């Protein structure tokens, strides 16, 4: 089999490339996906409110685990990644957050990445998006990604939590992806107008599937990339459970879109990576690149949970006897509790004036439950997810063998820098101040977690070590740039070889301020134009917020009360 392009991974980036490259009728594309189809009749991946289910089990989830994390009580921590058409957009929380404008301006300040500024990237965010309330300077109206905005009559806890954030002295913003990310406000989500998950399989592949120049093979696990000298010429993969070896050849390029965990694995198995690691595993060296698998970053988060004095939370939706009605309304009408991911409000703040742009993110949820659906509190409640955005901690990914079925060694090295501890202590204390504001007086009951007795630095640190979780945002493990640890250039081309690019979240040089899916799609849209030889979209001229000397917060309406004294 021979194609112009072979794409490894039908995820958030790979599906974008497959759709855009096959717009050229004379180009042939093979799309390889290790998982199966995105079964449209499986409510677990299609119903937004069922987002916890795909993380349970291994049908749609690679279910990686980290090595024991030394600063987290040596816990082996979850590292879920999507498996199937759509990749992690098939199992994520559907929060449509692009990051802060300053993230991209920081990227553009790095050598070789000058065209990755916010105003360079904004046109590609707009190209990818169709927002339900229409386009403007920041949002698109004709893209494959369906973006739904929260409606005014949604759960009152969303409005109360945003109001409480403002009363605590932080800004309000009407659009976390618009002029000003900083502040509290409504949170957009990747959900269709009919209440279905808007994965990249639904948005991009559905457009491309009818084209004769696209071939999609599922249950195809990539073993390694093939080379002739320094040129990538094809892919060796295993088909199905039997593991029958297959080979496909690429006339032009191999495009690696495996994500931040799989892409460095595949490069290392293919002979591209740290020379000492490859030598130890008897993998023939094609190109020594010490940065492959290094610079690994993620977002860590915690939940602060509270009981709710009024029966307005989503707790009844967790009871089995209420779920058939919810499912029927969603299935036939695309409405109701099932049609939302229930992350409809949140925010970004600076915990201290020293930060140039937000370093803390909030997701508000009108129920008290773990992200993966476990440990639901058996009463009406709500919670704030809170975590730091740009931790200085760095991890790494290393293959353990040549076997493509063996999971790699993953170490994020969470909380390995003193700044991490300062930020998380600040985050807990600030959250308590927010929850103490008058807007939540009608709803706020007792603090369930961490609990009123957790107050000192040592007590907070113990809670963080035991309870902080991944936000499922691994990135930066094949970073772009031109320094000695960079893996790809600003167009995704792997240094030192020809005919090979990496296009996914792994090429971010630094993690962004927020959820990764929207930015991963943007990266693929931008590089797709490069691959096709298209003129880049014209830079935006939209104005955007820069904090400058603006204080991180103003005086709160109510200064923090002792946790035991909440009304």
From Swiss-Prot:
Enzyme's top EC category: oxidoreductase
Pfam families cross-referenced by the UniProt entry: GMC_oxred_C, GMC_oxred_N
Cofactor(s) listed: FAD
Residue numbers annotated as active site: 473
UniProt record, GO biological process: glycine betaine biosynthetic process from choline
Binding locations of FAD: 4-33
Keywords: FAD, Flavoprotein, NAD, Oxidoreductase
The protein's name in its UniProt record: Oxygen-dependent choline dehydrogenase
Species in which this protein is naturally found: Yersinia pseudotuberculosis serotype I (strain IP32953)
Oxidoreductase is among the record's keywords: yes
Role, per record: Involved in the biosynthesis of the osmoprotectant glycine betaine. Catalyzes the oxidation of choline to betaine aldehyde and betaine aldehyde to glycine betaine at the same rate.
EC numbers on record: 1.1.99.1, 1.2.1.8
Gene3D superfamilies recorded: FAD/NAD(P)-binding domain (3.50.50.60), Glucose Oxidase, domain 3 (3.30.560.10)
Top-level taxonomic group: Bacteria
Keyword NAD: yes
Catalyzed chemical reaction(s): choline + A = betaine aldehyde + AH2; betaine aldehyde + NAD(+) + H2O = glycine betaine + NADH + 2 H(+)
Gene Ontology CC annotations of this record: membrane
GO molecular function: betaine-aldehyde dehydrogenase (NAD+) activity; choline dehydrogenase activity; flavin adenine dinucleotide binding
Associated pathway: Amine and polyamine biosynthesis; betaine biosynthesis via choline pathway; betaine aldehyde from choline (cytochrome c reductase route): step 1/1
Similarity comment text for this entry: Belongs to the GMC oxidoreductase family.
């Amino acid at each position: 089999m021979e194609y112009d392009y072979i794409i490894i991974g039908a995820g958030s980036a790979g599906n974008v490339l497959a759709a855009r490259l096959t717009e050229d009728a004379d180009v042939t594309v093979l799309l390889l996906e290790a998982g199966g189809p995105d079964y449209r009749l499986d409510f677990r991946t299609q119903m937004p409110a069922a987002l916890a289910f795909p993380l349970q089990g291994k049908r749609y989830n690679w279910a990686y685990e980290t090595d024991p994390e030394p600063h987290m009580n040596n816990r082996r921590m979850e590292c879920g990644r999507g498996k199937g058409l759509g990749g992690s957009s098939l199992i994520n929380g559907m929060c449509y957050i692009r990051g802060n404008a300053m993230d991209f301006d920081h990227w553009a300040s790095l050598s070789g990445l000058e065209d990755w500024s916010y105003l360079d990237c904004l046109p590609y965010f707009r190209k990818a998006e169709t927002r339900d309330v229409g386009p403007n300077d920041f949002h698109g109206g004709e893209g494959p990604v369906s973006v739904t905005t929260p409606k005014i009559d949604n759960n009152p806890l969303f409005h109360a939590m945003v109001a409480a954030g403002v009363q605590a002295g932080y800004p309000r913003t009407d659009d976390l992806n618009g002029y000003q990310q900083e502040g509290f406000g409504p949170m957009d989500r990747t959900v269709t107008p009919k209440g279905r998950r808007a994965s990249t399989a639904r948005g991009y592949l559905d457009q491309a599937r009818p084209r004769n120049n696209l071939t999609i093979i599922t249950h195809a696990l990539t073993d390694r990339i093939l080379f002739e000298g320094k040129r990538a010429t094809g892919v060796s993969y295993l088909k199905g459970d039997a593991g029958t070896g297959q080979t496909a050849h690429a006339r032009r390029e191999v495009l690696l879109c495996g994500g931040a965990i799989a892409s460095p694995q595949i490069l290392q198995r293919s002979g591209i990576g740290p020379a000492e690691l490859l030598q130890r595993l008897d993998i023939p060296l094609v190109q020594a690149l010490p940065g492959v698998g290094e610079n690994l970053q993620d977002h860590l988060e915690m939940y602060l949970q509270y009981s709710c004095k009024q029966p307005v939370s989503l707790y009844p939706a967790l009871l089995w006897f209420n779920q058939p009605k919810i499912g029927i309304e969603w299935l036939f009408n695309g409405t109701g509790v099932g049609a939302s991911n229930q992350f409809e409000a949140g925010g970004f703040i600076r915990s201290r004036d020293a930060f140039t742009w937000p370093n803390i993110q909030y997701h508000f949820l009108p129920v008290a439950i773990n992200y993966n659906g476990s440990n639901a509190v058996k009463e009406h409640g709500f919670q704030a997810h809170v975590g730091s955005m740009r931790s200085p901690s760095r991890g790494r990914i290393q293959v353990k063998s040549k076997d493509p079925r063996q999971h790699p060694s993953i170490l994020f090295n969470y909380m390995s820098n003193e700044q991490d501890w300062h930020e998380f202590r600040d985050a807990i204390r600030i959250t308590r101040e927010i929850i103490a504001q008058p807007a939540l007086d009608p709803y706020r009951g007792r603090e369930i977690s961490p609990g009123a007795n957790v107050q000192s630095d040592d007590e907070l640190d113990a809670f963080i070590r035991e309870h902080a979780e991944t936000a499922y945002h691994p990135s930066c493990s094949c970073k772009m740039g031109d320094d000695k640890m960079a893996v790809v250039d600003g167009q995704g081309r792997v240094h030192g070889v020809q005919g090979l690019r990496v296009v996914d979240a792994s090429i971010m040089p630094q993690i962004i301020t927020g959820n990764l899916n929207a930015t991963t799609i943007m990266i693929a849209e931008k590089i797709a134009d490069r691959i096709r030889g298209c003129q880049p979209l014209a830079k935006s001229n939209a104005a955007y917020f820069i904090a400058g000397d603006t204080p991180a917060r103003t005086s709160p309406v109510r200064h923090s009360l002792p946790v035991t004294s909440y009304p």
